[in-house]
Amino acid sequence: NLIDFKNMIKCTNTRHWVSFTNYGCYCGYGGSGTPVDELDKCCQVHDKCYDTAKHVCKCSPSMTMYSYDCSEGKLTCKDNNTKCKDFVCNCDRTAALCFAKAPYNNKNFKIDPTKGCQ
C-alpha cells in the first residue's frame, strides 16, 4: 500500500519521500506523455506494475498491505506474502531502489503537465 511504499522510499533514499509525489510526468497520481528523465521513468514503470497487479491479481495495489524487511537500505519482500501482496511489494521495492539510483532534477519537481508531458 502507499504507506508501505512511502516507508520503502524512506529506507532506500536520503531525499524526503514527498519529493517524489509530484515529480515529472509520472511521479504522483496518474501520468501521461514521455518521462522527463530517469527518475520519472522509474515512476512510469511503477505505474505500469500497479496496472498489471490490478489486472492479473485483481487487487488494489495502493491499498494492498504486505510484509517486507528494511535493513541498511536493503529491501526484501517476505515469504509469507500472498501472490498478490508479493507482486505489489516487488512493484514498490523495484521503484524505491530505482529512485535511490536515479539523479534528482529539482527543475522537474512540480512541472506543469500540460506543458512538459507531451
From Swiss-Prot:
Organism listed in the record: Micrurus nigrocinctus (Central American coral snake)
GO molecular function: calcium ion binding; calcium-dependent phospholipase A2 activity; phospholipid binding; signaling receptor binding; toxin activity
Role this protein plays: Snake venom phospholipase A2 (PLA2) that has only a weak enzymatic activity. It has a myotoxic activity in vivo (dystrophic effect). PLA2 catalyzes the calcium-dependent hydrolysis of the 2-acyl groups in 3-sn-phosphoglycerides.
Tissue: Expressed by the venom gland.
Cofactor info, note text: Binds 1 Ca(2+) ion.
Active site: 46, 92
Similarity section: Belongs to the phospholipase A2 family. Group I subfamily. D49 sub-subfamily.
Catalytic activity: a 1,2-diacyl-sn-glycero-3-phosphocholine + H2O = a 1-acyl-sn-glycero-3-phosphocholine + a fatty acid + H(+)
Cystines in this chain: 11-70, 25-117, 27-43, 42-98, 49-91, 59-84, 77-89
Record localization: Secreted
Gene Ontology CC: one annotated term: extracellular region
GO biological process: arachidonate secretion; fatty acid biosynthetic process; lipid catabolic process; phospholipid metabolic process; positive regulation of fibroblast proliferation
Protein name per the record: Basic phospholipase A2 nigroxin B
Coiled-coil regions, chain positions: none
Entry keyword annotation includes Cell wall biogenesis/degradation: no
One of the Pfam families matching this protein, by short name: Phospholip_A2_1
InterPro entries in the record: PLipase_A2, PLipase_A2_Asp_AS, PLipase_A2_dom, PLipase_A2_dom_sf, PLipase_A2_His_AS
PANTHER family: PHOSPHOLIPASE A2, PHOSPHOLIPASE A2 FAMILY MEMBER
